[in-house]
Amino acid sequence: FAKLFDIKELRVYDLYPAAAEKFKEDMKDAVKGDIIVCSDPKDASIGDVVVGFTQSKDKYIKDEWIKPGQIVFPMGSYTECEDALLLNADKIIVDHVGQCMHRGALHDVVADGKLKEEDIYATIGDVAVGRKPTDAANERIICVPIGTGAMDIAVAGIVYKRALEKGLGGTFEFL
C-alpha cells in the first residue's frame, strides 16, 4: 500500500503507546517518510488524510480538528467521528449507501434522524469514474468504506495479480 503513495509523514496514535511504537517499527521499511508516534489523537489528525482503525465506541475524532483539504476515513463498523464532524462535512462519500446508513460511522446520526440518504454526496464509484466531482483541496470530506463483498473481490484480484507478477504465494486445496 505504501508503495502506491508517496507518504512523507505518517502520524500514529494508539491508546497503548507500545502498540503505536510496534506499528512504527513494523512499518519503517514500508513507509518512505517519517513515522511519528503521537501522544494524543489530535496530534495524529494533522495531515491530508485521517484514518481511524479502531474498535472504539468513543467518538474521538473531533469536528474542530479537521480542516478544509482533509479527508477522513472512519474504517469499519465503529463510531470514531463525533456527530458534528459528520454533519458539518462538505461531502460524505460511501462505498454502499444502504450498508453505511445502518452501521459504522454514520449509524448514530442516522438513528437520531440527523442524516438521511439524500445527505450522502456520492459513492466511491461515482467519484472514481468522475460522475461526482470533489474539491479535495478545499473541502472537508468524510469517506465511509464500510466494506462490500464486491470491493473485497476487486482488492483480492489486484493482490492476486501482483503476487503472481512477483512470484509470491502458492496453491492449496480446500477441504
Task: Locate predicted features.
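A short helix->loop->beta-strand "cap" motif at the edges of active sites that frequently abuts
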Residues: I7-K8, K67-Q70, A89-D90
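Short acidic low-complexity segments
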Residues: V31-G47
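Rossmann-fold NAD(P) dinucleotide-binding segment
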Residues: V49, Q55-M75, D83-A84
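An anion/phosphate-binding loop that grips the pyrophosphate of nucleotide cofactors and donors
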Residues: G47-D48, A89
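Adenosine-phosphate binding glycine-rich loop
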Residues: L85-L175
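Short glycine-rich anion-binding loops that position phosphate/pyrophosphate groups of nucleotides
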Residues: Q55-D58, S77-Y78, G98-Q99, T148
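NAD(P)-binding Rossmann-fold cofactor-contacting core
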Residues: K3-M27
